[in-house]
């Protein structure tokens, strides 16, 4: 977060040093790019990773989530319309590696938003999720647990 603020300050200073009569976005953008280069060169002195990497991970996370949301929505619609007799609803558990409260909450929200699954309970130590799924057959269960693990890996990558 400090790197972003520093980069914006560098961009504004760049605009001020250009001595133009009015604000130009192109000047601000060039100052932002210069700040990006400076921060990249000096980022080893910061305690955090280079912030553009985190932005890239967040964009990747959004893409993965949207893909999972669309595919699970189609799967749920398929079950409702064509496979109502084949449904096998039930509970399953998932052990998480997340430790912070915000990460656990975020993973819970992602599971709840995904069609066909919802978090029923989280254990007292916040390490185990109890999830209700529309289908707990072996194939669907493995698919759901893989997608939850993928969400968890992305949350861990963003939070580093």
From Swiss-Prot:
Record key words, sorted: Antiport, Cell membrane, Ion transport, Membrane, Transmembrane, Transmembrane helix, Transport
Keyword tRNA processing: no
Membrane-spanning intervals of the chain: 22-42, 55-75, 100-120
GO MF, any single term: monoatomic cation transmembrane transporter activity
Membrane topology: Multi-pass membrane protein
Subcellular location field: Cell membrane
GO cellular component, one term: plasma membrane
Main location: membrane
Subunit architecture: May form a heterooligomeric complex that consists of seven subunits: mnhA2, mnhB2, mnhC2, mnhD2, mnhE2, mnhF2 and mnhG2.
Assigned protein family: Belongs to the CPA3 antiporters (TC 2.A.63) subunit E family.
Protein known as: Putative antiporter subunit mnhE2
Organism (species): Staphylococcus aureus (strain JH9)
């Amino acid at each position: 977060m400090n790197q972003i603020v520093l980069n914006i300050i560098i961009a504004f200073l760049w605009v001020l040093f250009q001595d133009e009569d009015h604000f130009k976005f192109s000047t601000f953008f060039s100052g932002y790019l210069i700040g990006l280069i400076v921060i990249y060169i000096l980022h080893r002195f910061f305690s955090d990773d280079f912030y553009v990497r985190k932005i890239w991970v967040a964009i990747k996370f959004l893409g993965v989530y949207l893909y999972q949301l669309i595919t699970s929505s189609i799967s749920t619609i398929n079950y409702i319309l064509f496979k109502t007799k084949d449904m096998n609803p039930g509970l399953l558990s998932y052990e998480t590696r997340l430790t912070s409260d915000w990460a656990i909450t975020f993973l819970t929200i992602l599971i709840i938003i995904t069609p066909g699954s919802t978090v029923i309970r989280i254990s007292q130590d916040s390490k185990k999720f109890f999830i209700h799924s529309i289908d707990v057959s072996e194939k669907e269960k493995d698919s759901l647990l893989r997608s939850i693990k993928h969400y968890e890996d992305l949350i861990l990558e963003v939070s580093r």
